[in-house]
Design a protein with these regions (language model features):
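Catalytic core of pol beta-like nucleotidyltransferases
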Residues: 3-42, 50-56, 67-123
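Short, aliphatic-rich beta-strand segments
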Residues: 61-65
């Protein structure tokens, strides 16, 4: 009985390691895709994936901060579409949210800004 419990713990640890490796692989893929588009853009993972409270089917919320005065419609095509396409390729849902650095700093008082700054993970 002790041997079975020990093997079960080892297997559970192995599964957690595999999940963590998969999460790192996806974060790295998002980082690489964004870097191909704009090496100077900053990205922050937020939401349940950043907090570690995700469940099967949770999406990947990513804040993208651009070094420009204002985000344009063309920026959504340039930045959002390639990340969403990556999600389709790896069977995940990636939800990019775009802000210019200036707009992000001007909205520092919002709950969204507070939560991202508190729990976000730079990718």
């Amino acid at each position: 009985n002790l041997v079975i419990r020990k093997k079960t713990r080892i297997f559970a640890t192995y599964i957690l390691i595999l999940i963590d490796m998969e999460k790192k692989r996806i974060i790295e893929a998002m980082h690489n895709r964004l870097h191909e588009i704009d090496p100077h853009a900053k990205a922050i993972l937020f939401g349940s994936r950043a907090r570690g409270t995700e469940h099967e089917g949770s999406d990947w919320d990513v804040l993208i901060l651009l070094d420009k005065p204002k985000v344009t419609l063309q920026d959504y095509d340039k930045y959002s579409y390639p990340l969403r396409e990556l999600g389709w390729d790896i069977d995940e849902i990636i939800n990019p949210v775009l802000f210019s650095q200036k707009e992000w700093e001007e909205n520092h008082y919002t709950l969204f800004n507070h939560n991202v700054n508190k729990e976000g993970i730079a990718i």
